[in-house]
Amino acid sequence: MNRQAVKGTQIIAIVAALAGWLVPGLGHLVLRRWSKAAVYFLCIGGLACAGLAMRGGVFGAGAEDLFNRLGFFADLGAGVFYFLAHQIQTAGPDVAHATGDYGTRLFAAAGMLNFLTVLEAYDIGRGGEAK
């Protein structure tokens, strides 16, 4: 493969990874993996929405301790769901019930799962998986 083709492949892989982070499944959609894109969007979106429906907390950027920083990193992985949740969450987490804690964990799990799909989209974009 010549240099130009390698550079084009790297650009496609980076664009797919960034798109996949911003909107779960969009990176696979860019790579024309229709079914994977739909499954990833529905699963990650479902986890994020379930976490918010349970009044789970969303970690902010101004974290003071390591746990909150890791929570912010995990939540940030959810892409557009994080930014929407950060804007619409006005009441705060439900700390009086266990469901609020479960919701916080579900939202963080959605973000971490999206990071895995971003890595997969990048790998596919680089030619790491048979088409």
Model-flagged regions — what are they?
Residues 5-9, 19-36:
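Membrane interfacial helix-start motif at the N-side
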